[in-house]
Amino acid sequence: MEKEYCPKNIEPYVQQYWKDNKVFHVYEDDKKEKYYCLPMLPYPSGKLHMGHVRNYTISDVISRYQRMLGKNVLQPIGWDAFGLPAEEAAIKNKTKPSDWTQKNIKYMKKQLQSLGFSYDWSREITTCKPDYYCWEQWFFIQLYKKKLVYKKNSFVNWCPYDKTVLANEQVIKGCCWRCQNKIKVKKIPQWFIKIRNYAESLHNDLNDLENWPEKVKNMQRNWIGRSKGFEIVFNVLNSNKKIKAFTNRLDLIMGATYISISPCHEFSVHVSKEKKEIQKFIDQKINNSASQEDIEKIKFEGINSNMFVIHPITNKKIPVWISNFIQKEYGTNAIISVPGHNQNDWNFSIKHNLKIKYVIKNKKYKNTQLHNLFTTEKGILYNSGEFNNLNYHNATEKIKKTLLKKKIIKEKINYKLQDWCISRQRYWGTPIPMATKKNGEIIAIPEKNLPVLLPEIKNYSDSLQKPMDSSSKWANIKIENQDVIRETDTFDTFMESSWYYARYTCPNFNTGMIDPTASKYWLPVDQYIGGIEHATMHLIYFRFYHKLLRDFKLVELNEPVKNLICQGMVLSEAFYQFDKNNQRNWIHPSCVQVEKNLKGETIKVDIKNKKKVIYAGMIKMSKSKNNGIEPELMINRYGADTLRLFIMFAAPIESSLEWRESGVKGIYRFLKKIWKLVFNHIEVKKINKKVNFDILNKKQKKMYCLLHKTIIKVSDDIGRRKSFNTAISSIMELVNELSIFKIENEEDKSIIKESLMSIIKMLYPFTPHFCFRLWQYLNKNCCIDYETWPTFEKKILSSDKNTLIIQINGKKQCAIEVKNHLNKEEILSYIENQSIIQKKIKNLKIIKIIYIPQKVINFVV
C-alpha cells in the first residue's frame, strides 16, 4: 500500500476497472427490488459546470447507497441534444450543428467519467439521433389521430432575437427565458398539444406526490391556475352582441362596475375597426399581454371601448374596458370587475378613475363608519338590494338561481394553463411529421416514411432554417402521388426531454416507442434530481407526457416520479472593477489577491493591474459574472473524490452551496487522514476474529458503540432524510475518535478493522475511487462495488449507558444511568418516572427543563 494518498494514480485505474467489467450495467431482474435514480438530462453545451457536478453527485451517492442495500439500481445518462445554442454555434463557426453537438458530447462524457459516476453507459441516448426522435414523431401522429394536437392561427410569444415562438412557461417577466430579451406577441399558424385537457388531473394528482417539495407543487398549482366559478352572459347595449365574462366570486356581482376584456378578445377587435385610438392601444398592448408572473408588477393600462353591457340583475349599464391585466387566453378573455373587493380591479379603477362600489362589510371595521373600506374577504352582503345580509354561501346560491332562470349562467372551471405550443421556427430540432396538401388539408406523414430527417446544410447564414423553407426541395414532396408541402417548423425541445426517462428503460427497443416489459419493471422513477427552475416548464411537461403515454397504454401508473430533489445553486465569490465607460468588468476570483495599501489597510486587488476590486458577494456561478470554477481544475488539483465529498458536505442539498477552496482543502486533508489511518493499521487485515461485545472493556465498548451509533445515523441521514452533510459530519467524528484509539490487544485490533471497514463502506457512495482502493488493501483485492451496507446491532446500543447528573435549579440531586440510544423525549420520560426524582419534584412547579446531552438534566422550578 502506498504511504501517501494520490488520486491521480487511483482514479483512472478504478474507472478503467468499472468500464472493463461493466460493473454498472443492469438488466430487469424480478428477483431483486429495483431502484431507478435519475438526474435531469444535460444539454451538451461544451463543458460541465459546478451545478452539473452537484446534481450528478447527489444522484450518484443515492444510486451507490441503494445498490449497497441490495437493490437493482438503474442510473442512466444521455444528452438533450437539440436546441438553439448548437444552431448559433453552427452559424458562427460555419459547421454543422450535429458536428458541434457530437464534439461537445464526447468532451462532456469524458468529464462525467472522470468524476466516477456509476452510469449504465449502455443506455446512453442522444435526442438528436433519428433512432430516438423517430418515436417522438410517431407518437405525435397518434396524438393527431386522437385529435389531441391541432394547428391554428394563434397569438404566440415571439422572441425577436432568437426568431422563434416561446411557450407561456418560457416567458419570464415578459422576457425570453433563454436570451432575456423582451418578447412580442404575434399571430401565426402554430401546432399545439391539448395539455388543457389534462389540467384537472395535473392539478389533482399533485396531492399524490407526497415526496415532492411543497414549493414545487405550489408553483405548479399556481401555474395551472385552477379557478372554479361562473360564466355569465352579458348583453351589449344597443347591439345583438353578447360578452361571456367569468367570475369566481358570484356573491360580488352587485358590486360589478365594469367588464374587463383583453386586447385579444374578439370584441376588442370588433370595436377597434371603427376607432383608431383603440386599434393603436391594442397593437401596443397585444405585445405585452400579461403573463402570470407579470400581474403583480403590471402598470394596469387600459382604454374605454365606449361600449356598455347590461347588468343582468340591476339592468343598469356598465362600461366595457380593454385592459392589459387579463392573462392572454384565460377563460373567455373577459372578467367581471368588482374593484371594491379585488386588488387588480381596484388598482385599475384607481388609475382610470372608475366607479368603486362596496358590497361586503369589512370585518376589521365592523359597526363603525369605516365598514365600507376595501376587503377581499368573504362576508355579509350590503348595498346589494335583495341579497343584503346574506353570507357568501347563501348569496352565491340565491344569485345563481336568479341567473339560471334567465338562462345566462353556467358553472365553469377555468385554468390559466394554456395548450402547449410546440412549434419552433428553428432548424436544429425534430421535424414535425405533418404536411399540407394544395387544397389546405393537413395530413400526417405516413408512418412507413418515418423518421422525417432534417435536410443537409450547404450554406450558412444568419438562419439555418432556409433549407426547410416552404419553397425548398426538402419541403415539396409527394405523398400517395399528391403534391404536399412538409411542415417546416420543428418541435419545442421540451418534447424530447418529456419522455426520455421512459426510453432509458429500453434504449435499444426497435419495434416500438417503449418496451412494455422493461417500463413496467423500472417505472416509476424512484428518485429524480434537478433544479427548482424547472418546476413550471420541464416538470409540468414531464408529468403531462407521462399521462399521454399512459392513455396510449405505453406506460402504467399516473405519475412518472415518486421522489423529487431540487438541489440548490452553487455560489462563488464575485469581484468587479469599473472600466473607463463606467461599466462593470468582472474579475475571476483566481485573479484576485489580498495586499496592503500604502495606509497599511488590507485590500483585494486584481493581480494583473494591481487595482482595487469591489466585492459583489456570493453570487451564482455564471459566465456573465466570470466567477465559475472549472471542475477539471479541482479534479486535477485534489481528485474527483475530494470534489464529490466537498459538494455533498458543504451545504444541505436544497440550500445554496458557497464555493470556498479552503473547504475543498479541508476535505482533501480528511481523506489523507483516513488513508494514513489505514496505512498505519494495515496489519489488521490479517485479523479474522469478530468483535465479541460481551468481553469488551469500557474503552472498547465506548468505541464500538460509537461505531454502531454512527452506522444508524449515517444510514438514516442518507436513506430517509437525504441529509448528506450531516452523514459526512458523523463519519468525521467517528474517524477522529478512531484516530486516538490505542491498540493494546487483539480485541482492539478487531475493533479497528471493523471500524475502518465500516467507514470505508459508509464513505463509498461519496468517494468511490478512494474507497475502492482502500477496500482492496484491507480485503485482499476484493471489490467493494458488490459489498453491502454496514449493519448495526441493537443489543449493542441497548447496553450502552451513560450517567446523567440530575439537578434542580442548578444543584445536584443525584446521578442516573440512561441508555445512550434514547432521544431527548425518551430520556425525560424515563427520568420523570424514577421514584427518586418524583419525590424531589413533588409539589414543585416545573418552569422548564434544561437538557445537555449525555451530561445534565436541570429542572428549573
UniProtKB/Swiss-Prot annotation:
A motif ('KMSKS' region) lies at residues 620-624. It catalyses: tRNA(Leu) + L-leucine + ATP = L-leucyl-tRNA(Leu) + AMP + diphosphate. ATP binds at residue 623. The keyword Glycoprotein does not apply. Pfam families: Anticodon_1, tRNA-synt_1, tRNA-synt_1_2, tRNA-synt_1g. Keywords: Aminoacyl-tRNA synthetase, ATP-binding, Cytoplasm, Ligase, Nucleotide-binding, Protein biosynthesis. The keyword Protein biosynthesis applies. PANTHER family: LEUCINE--TRNA LIGASE, MITOCHONDRIAL, LEUCYL-TRNA SYNTHETASE. This is Leucine--tRNA ligase. The lineage of its organism: Bacteria, Pseudomonadati, Pseudomonadota, Gammaproteobacteria, Enterobacterales. The gene is leuS.
